[in-house]
From Swiss-Prot:
The gene is scp1. Residues 233-391 form the SSD domain. Keywords: Endoplasmic reticulum, Glycoprotein, Golgi apparatus, Lipid metabolism, Lipid-binding, Membrane, Repeat, Steroid metabolism, Transmembrane, Transmembrane helix, WD repeat. GO terms for biological process: cellular response to hypoxia; positive regulation of ergosterol biosynthetic process; regulation of cholesterol biosynthetic process; SREBP signaling pathway; steroid metabolic process. A motif (ER export signal) lies at residues 396-401. This is Sterol regulatory element-binding protein cleavage-activating protein. Forms a tight complex with scp1, composed of 4 copies of scp1 and 4 copies of sre1. It is found in: Endoplasmic reticulum membrane; Golgi apparatus membrane. The chain crosses the membrane at residues 36-56, 230-250, 266-286, 291-311, 338-358, 368-388, 423-443, 545-565. Glycans are attached at residues 94, 168, 454. Residues 1-35, 251-265, 312-337, 389-422, 566-1086 are cytoplasmic.
Amino acid sequence: MRIFTLGKGRISRGYARQVNPSLFAKYSYCIANNPWYFILVFTLLSITGIYSSLVAYQQSLYDQSLARWSAWYAESINAEANVITKQLYLLGTNTSVFSEDYLSNAYRWETSFHQYLAEYGYPCIRDEKSCVTISPIPKYYGKVDPVAQYSYTKGLPENEREVNKLRNDTIAEGFDSLSAFVITYFLKPEQVDTFHVVLKKFISETPNLYASLLDTSPTTVVARIPDLTVIYRWYLWVGFGVGLFAYLYLSLVRLHDIRAKFGLTATIFIQSGTAYFSTCSLLYFFERTGPICPWPMAYYIIIFMDIENSFRLLRAVIASPQTKRVPSRIMEGFSSTIIASFSSLLKKLLTLFVLSFFVYPLVQEFCLFLACSFVVSFLLHGSFFLAVLSVDIRRLELQDFLDSNSSNRNSKWWVPYLEYVRFMWSPWIIDNLGTVSFHMYVIYLQLQSSTDINGSWRLASPNIRFLITLYHRLGRILRERKLFPLITTGWFGDPTFLEALKEKTMAENLVIALYRPVILDTVNRRDYTNVYNSFHDRRVWRWSTFFSILFAIDFAVGLLVKALLRGWSDHDELSTDTTLHEEKFRIEPVPVHHQLDILKIAVSENYKTFASVGLDRCLVVWDLRQWCTKLVLSKEQMPRTLKAIALDPQGNYVSLFSKDTLFILNVESPCLMLQHSYHCKPNSKLNVFWMPGTHKDDEWKNFELVVVESSGEIQVFSLTIEIEGADIALVEKFQLSSPIIKSISIVSPTANRIACLTESGEVTVYSKKGPVWSPKILSQNKNYLTETKKDIYGIAMADILFLARDSGVDMIDLKNDELLHSFTLPPIKVNTFSVGVSNSRFVNGQFRVSSISFCFTHAVTEKVLYYYYGNECNESYIILNKWDQQPNLVDVHDPDNSLACLTFDELQENIHEVEDASECVMSSDGLYIFGMRRKSSSGICPTADEKNEDNGFTLRNRKLRTGHYNWTSYVPLLDSYMQDMEHKKNTHSGGETQVWEVWMYSQSEKKHRCKSLKMYNSLIIADPGPSLAVSDRCVAIVLGNYVALVGYGSEIFRDFYQIRNSDEMDRILRRKRKNLQRKRSGTIGC
């Protein structure tokens, strides 16, 4: 086996390398295979996160003194008297605040004071702490000296040289600055006196520790919720939410491959709400004891990000072939988009991190909230939304199977009007909603907060302290493994002190910046328990700990149950596949009840009905979906000579053609409906096509039966089927000047066509538009006159004809009679050429495909060649043809990225060559090729002499060798066959038996597989019989007197026909069949 790739003038062997399943593929496949279980698990986990945040909010509202306070905003100092605060300032120089001595002494003093407070019943509600930088401090020592009384570590420098040295060490705008550790206590009015007594007594008992550090008579100030956090005009926010819900719903309405539009819209809103509350819960658990974030805009920003991720996943899943199983489609879509979604998340987190250096603390807190929300939302998107989407696709496939006529495609009258505002769903808007929204709102918050503080727009100066505190907060868990107590940003709001400090420093403007305390990163759990023994804090701590532990236990139990019930892989544990998403190579024999070799096979267009005729002159019609026989005709019931067999597009009727008579049989209610004579030359071969006509209803149908003779004569019959019976009449007759090599039917959206390739090299296309058939000879390419035509193949829905020449293949648009593209291919053997297109769909009047594949036998080397033209990106597509806007063809939604549209020159070429096979058959999507070859039981392929010797014993040649032209019984033939078997057994003294194997190649997974075929009889077979594609992933190959259906992509064989093994579906189908049989039993007899 040799695999190589050609693309844009370069060879890339890595393109054909097998792609191993990633962790994301295993994860998504596991969820999509058991969606309801994971929906339950993630719902419980979300409830735990939401409930803990509601507990925090309820505790904050329960205490009236906290109902109007928020620690998220620390800059506003104008407030009403609701909460009394006491602030103690531990001041020092900008350099000393980072020294180990300063931090140790500050922490020791704070711990001692809190223990002292605990002895008196801890009369304060809580304490809030922050690091404060006050700048600028003038360069002159005389102006700074009055502030020195607030420093506890050391006095300020006594000479100007040291002042200049200090100024060089500063990090705040290049000026000298004064740093402080502020302890803010929020007290109830009745607790103020007690707090004063305890504070004075503590200071008097510790004269050597911070004797001059405090303002011994702290000013009573007020904390409040600034105007920015108060929600005015709720109806505007609710109206915006309703509008956003409508926009998202209409976006999903335009996705016709999604069934539950309202359900998925609600899922995204619920998922965003879960992320919002879970973020509040996480921040509350690790840091905050105040109310939850009061900004409604944060919720909508989370929704915008969910829209980005959801539509990225939806586009990938819709672009995957619909014939694959739902878990496989989810797996491929999630695996292809997880990297893009994760990179988008990283970009947003990096942007928020950079912005945090240039915004005020309240906006920093908002950035922190958004960052945490984005992470939680990303995790929920990859779990909860993934499971809900898999359920919805399953329901859509069930609905399409049960009643395709009741599809909701364009079912709403107002859907076409969305085309006028389609710019609202442009790819750029959908892909950048979250990015644009959070940038705009962060800028808005910075503008409003800076206006409140400075009176004008201003960015904060970059300060390294934010990075230091962030590092310590992360290191608290990852490195030091110490738990940060329930602390939030403090509040620096003593107007008296600020005014006094402003006068003493003679500074016109004081810029105040608050930061979380670095020193508190050294507080461990034991010290926290000893120090923070407030009733509110202890209760909050217990609730948060309980629900967080429950969160982890739920997830662990879910994984354990999943592993015990089904295992990590939902495939058969006895399977030889080692990876979870590696799909099955399946061979299923069809017991078609033939006793001799099968000569002819046929399948309906909907892959529902399969028919076969053998040397025993028996006809068997098989229902592939129900896996049962529908019609069996014995030799006595069949015509003496059978020239052709054909099934109608729906698989309900079968036509048989003898040398001068045609028969129409009903397959559903087995009976002969019609018998009619026709003209046919004695030695000519027939090719018969059913063309759809006018259908008034299920009780009156019209077809056109086109009979093509190899001599060049074409007859068109009009067939009408009613309840009372059927009628047929010859309506057209054509005669070509030379014999026909090959003829095909093309039932396109615009016309019914028959294309014929003659021995003279002409390609004549007969088209019916309206009541008249009109012929036309194709002559678009100048090479037509000089090169020999080898084969033709059509893509019906695209109205495209592929013409194989000596030097390549031409793709011709039959609608416009135009040459679209020429592919350079090696010489093709006659009647071995086939074409497949993957993921075909109609979008906005365009017929789009993801790839084009050619499979044929080389005319010189007799080797099977497979050419694939596509792109590694699963969202890329090619436009084969375009039509005017028509309701039955047009999908209003455009699920594809317009940037992913490729031209034929941009396609990558992948070539696969099978050296030890001479025949093959390709699936209709062009992604799988199958073949059958013979080898000995020892695994060695037979030699040419062995093949020639076996040709004498094959039943296929038995008719010519024994002279049984008019068979009247099976006995003489079977007796002769048993004698030949005995001779064969004596000839092969080694006792070797024939072994056949099926080989396949999967372009989608770059895999080559072989599997031995079980022999169900003792027939000696030289070559396999006819073969044809049965579905997008399945083919039928004849071997002797039985048919092997070969597929790749599912362990359950019925999955190849887009049927799911559901008990509910089986019950519905059985009920519908019984009703149909009762209806027909009274009108049509067998």
